[in-house]
Amino acid sequence: MKNDICSKDYSSFVDIVQYKDRNPNKYDRNKFEKNEIDIIWEQKEDKYYQIVLMLLYSGVRISEMLDLKKENVHLDEQYFDVICSKTENGIRKVPIADKILPYYKAWYESCPECEYLLHTEAGKHFEYRNYYDSYFKPLMEQLGINRTPHCCRHTCISMLAEAGINQTIIKKIVGHLGAMTLTEKVYTHFDIKELVDAINRI
């Protein structure tokens, strides 16, 4: 090589096919099918399947749910505050649907000494790996369903869209504020009742 000139083009020997799907920022976008959700509802008496339903009908990220503290859960008004999110836009109020409100109440009362809504059998804060490996994954395998916690979020967004919910309301609920137009951010405001009404339609 002389003067930065190479006599041979070696790029033709580089195989990029094996790397094309290795995007570290790519999430699993598969959503739960209706029959799969129905199967999970059949297990609703199990408190750990209840967590899956809480994820499906809130659209929160798994980290947001596991980090949710009781002090930020408002059962009477049917919403909770997400104050810990991976993005600034994720800080928001999330409505609690009527159909899963009893599960929030049950978890809220299940371990008075734990500050977190969800907790291990020992009353400790759930770490993601612990929750996924010991609970979510085995529960899905038991039902023959191949899904990840993030699929719950994507499913909620899809169900809201299919129910004809206003796109701005969907963005408010799931924390996609970064995708909002300036007009949506500045001039569009919804009270919690409107958000609860929206989540109750799925």
Map each language-model feature to its residues.
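Short, basic (Lys/Arg/His-rich) helix/loop patches that form interaction surfaces
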Residues: 42, 94, 109-116, 124-125, ...
